[in-house]
Each structure stands twice: as C-alpha cells, then as structure tokens.
Swiss-Prot record:
InterPro entries: NDK-like_dom, NDK-like_dom_sf, Nucleoside_diP_kinase, Nucleoside_diP_kinase_AS. It is an enzyme of class 2 (transferase). Its cofactor is Mg(2+). ATP binds at residues 9, 57, 85, 91, 102, 112. PROSITE patterns: NDPK, NDPK_LIKE. It comes from Spinacia oleracea. This is Nucleoside diphosphate kinase 1. The keyword Nucleotide-binding applies. Belongs to the NDK family. SMART domains: NDK. GO terms for molecular function: ATP binding; metal ion binding; nucleoside diphosphate kinase activity. One of its GO terms (biological process) is GTP biosynthetic process. Its EC number is 2.7.4.6. Major role in the synthesis of nucleoside triphosphates other than ATP. The ATP gamma phosphate is transferred to the NDP beta phosphate via a ping-pong mechanism, using a phosphorylated active-site intermediate.
C-alpha cells in the first residue's frame, strides 16, 4: 500500500490545527503509520528542502520551518500521495479550493500550514529522512470497510 509524508508546519501547530488536519486524513480512510512532534534544526530543514536550495525563497522557507515545532507524519492508503495533495490544496492558499486544508486555513504562500509529498518517490525519500527507524506496521479494523 502506498505511503506519503505529511508535515504540519509551525503555523499549523501554533494555530491549533493539528487535530483538524489529522481528522481529515483519518476521515478519508487513510491509516496513520508514524507521527512525531519535533523542533527542526537548520541543517535538517535544509536537507529536507534540498531540491529547492537554488530558489530565491529557500532561506525564508528554512527559517519558517525552524521557527517552531512541526508534526511529521506518515499516512498509508490507496493513492494517498495524489489524494493527500488534493486534501491539502494548491501550494498558494489563494489558489486552493474551499474544503481543502489550505483553502480553509491559509492565506499566504509563505505560511501555508502543511507540506505533503508531491510524488511517490519524494514520499519514499522524505519518509526515510524523517523516520529512519521505520514506521508502525498495523492495520485498522476498519480496513475492510474502506477497501474492497
């Protein structure tokens, strides 16, 4: 089954959106496989966002991520990467549809509440970076009510 990496960014944590965001993924039918609440240091943030290091907004993005604690998670389910991105909404919250996490809870692109893997290969890399000891292997008793 496919897995994705989701991070609730410092603004989402500070604004008390952790429960709401987790609830949306659970209600969709995805399974939480790993979760940690952590303060990210600059070298780790730079490693996570290494693919964006040449962008003019890179330093601001890193400063934003290290400004407070984040909630790092791994979710599992059929099509979880693409569907997770749909639940999250567009990178720019002003372009996000109402009903998405960013559409409902964010305004500025620089404070967009949440990160989600953009592809299966990105998810694999991000999960390995954030959870080097692996994730919890379990199956919800609701699995057969969600999947054929």
């Amino acid at each position: 089954m496919e897995q994705t990496f989701i991070m609730i960014k410092p603004d989402g944590v500070q604004r008390g959106l952790v429960g709401e965001i987790i609830s949306r993924f659970e209600k969709k039918g995805f399974s939480l496989k790993a979760l940690k609440f952590v303060n990210v240091d600059r070298p780790f943030a730079e490693k996570h966002y290494a693919d964006l290091s040449a962008k003019p907004f890179f330093n601001g993005l890193v400063e934003y991520i290290v400004s407070g604690p984040v909630v790092a998670m791994v979710w599992e389910g059929k099509g979880v990467v693409a569907t997770g991105r749909k639940l999250i909404g567009a990178t720019n919250p002003l372009a996000s549809e109402p009903g998405t996490i960013r559409g409902d809870f964010a305004i500025d692109i620089g404070r967009n509440v949440i990160h989600g893997s953009d592809a299966v290969d990105s998810a694999t890399k991000e999960i390995a970076l954030w959870f080097p000891d692996g994730v919890v292997h379990w199956q919800s008793s609701l699995h057969s009510w969600i999947y054929e």
